[in-house]
């Protein structure tokens, strides 16, 4: 069985993330969406909220059943080692993503030479979508229904109203 991990902060999960996730689920036997705690980023949603939103988004998207959601507070490579997984999948939107992903690939290879990274370009309609962009759009009252699922959109509106 070929297992792959799709790691990220997913703050929140977008349809761009779901695009990569669903396409990966068509290629691999099991895909774990790994919601990470990242000390370098100040998250709008807590780790638990991001996991809940990811699960809801996957359900709302009628995604394949070979997708599981997990969370981790640590280095992705350590999670892989703990679960006997060797593959990471990452989405690419632009050339700038590629440069960042190569840095992550090299760091992961340094930590564990057995870990491989698969880079998958995002579908054209989501090339510009990011969690940061979606949060900014919601904060300005703009419609983001093309970029996130209804549950995520509601959660963003609720969370950002509290913050204002």
Curated annotation (Swiss-Prot):
> For this protein, what is the EC number?
2.7.7.3
Question: Which residue numbers mark the site Transition state stabilizer?
Answer: 17
Catalytic function, reaction form = (R)-4'-phosphopantetheine + ATP + H(+) = 3'-dephospho-CoA + diphosphate
A GO molecular function held by the record: ATP binding
Report one GO cellular component.
cytoplasm
Q: Which residues bind ATP?
A: 9-10, 17, 91-93, 101, 126-132
Q: Which cofactor does it need?
A: Mg(2+)
**Keyword annotations of the record:** ATP-binding, Coenzyme A biosynthesis, Cytoplasm, Magnesium, Nucleotide-binding, Nucleotidyltransferase, Transferase
Q: Name one GO biological process term.
A: coenzyme A biosynthetic process
Task: Please give the InterPro entries that the UniProt record associates with this protein.
Answer: Cyt_trans-like (IPR004821), PPAT (IPR001980), Rossmann-like_a/b/a_fold (IPR014729)
Described by its record, this protein's role is as follows: Reversibly transfers an adenylyl group from ATP to 4'-phosphopantetheine, yielding dephospho-CoA (dPCoA) and pyrophosphate.
Q: Which family does it belong to?
A: Belongs to the bacterial CoaD family.
- Matching NCBIfam families: coaD_prev_kdtB, cyt_tran_rel
Q: Which protein are we looking at?
A: Phosphopantetheine adenylyltransferase
Q: Which gene encodes it?
A: coaD
């Amino acid at each position: 069985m070929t297992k792959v991990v799709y790691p990220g902060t997913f703050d929140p999960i977008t349809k761009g993330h779901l695009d990569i996730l669903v396409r990966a689920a068509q290629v691999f036997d099991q895909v774990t969406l790994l919601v990470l705690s990242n000390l370098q980023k100040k998250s709008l949603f807590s780790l638990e909220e991001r996991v809940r939103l990811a699960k809801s988004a996957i359900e709302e998207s009628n995604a394949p059943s070979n997708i599981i959601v997990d969370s981790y507070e640590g280095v992705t490579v350590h999670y892989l080692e703990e679960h006997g997984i060797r593959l990471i999948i990452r989405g690419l939107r632009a050339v700038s993503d590629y440069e960042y992903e190569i840095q992550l690939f090299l760091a992961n290879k340094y930590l564990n030479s057995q870990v491989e990274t698969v880079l998958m370009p995002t579908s054209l309609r989501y090339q510009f979508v990011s969690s940061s962009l979606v949060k900014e759009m919601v904060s300005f009252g703009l419609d983001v229904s093309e970029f996130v699922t209804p549950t995520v959109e509601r959660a963003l509106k609720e969370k950002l109203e509290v913050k204002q």
